[in-house]
């Protein structure tokens, strides 16, 4: 059996109850807010992020994870007997974490030239729970002892559909119609829906359950990285075929 560590960051918005079920390393994303360095999940939670969110939002200067943090996890993986590490990145390529994770890999190889630890980066190209669902998929396979090549193949083949609420003023019926149309067209393995109000999110989840024929696996609050375009009561829901 292959032993693979799965690493991601708090930008994936995985709910704590799901994280607890699997052996996933969740790294705290660092925010430079008004020249203060704060760590998501340590210095603030999803709930109180809105209390520290400055106005204007341009006071948030950077969102990152230092290369040293990744490097520490790689060393820990090797010392704990892991043969492989998969770092699942959230967001687009311009997120600083993509660069610092690669820097950490280069540093690890330079410092440990005889190490057999294999480290792979998987770019989910998705934000929030759309990346989180892929993390869970990888974690399940890793727990079963699946080889790293098979896990990477599964990640590349996974279909994720993100259905995001339209502009302000969009009626609930319009929001539902657009979500249902996308789900029918794509038939994704996973579907992620967002609504600005809890009431709408729950109602939308119930309607889509009827449409899809299976219930959502979770409802969750958006994390800090997703909060820029969401209201305080924003909620999202996830379906799995």
Each model region followed by its residue ranges:
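Local beta-strand N-terminus motif with an aromatic residue
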Residues: 3-4, 82
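Mixed-charge interfacial surface used for oligomerization/domain docking
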Residues: 3, 11-30, 36, 75, ...
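Short catalytic-loop micro-motif centered on adjacent basic/acidic residues
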Residues: 6-7, 61, 87, 121, ...
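N-terminal glycine-rich anion-binding loop in soluble enzyme alpha/beta folds
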Residues: 5-69
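Glycine-rich phosphate- or other oxyanion-binding loops that anchor nucleotides, phosphorylated ligands
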Residues: 57-58, 64-106
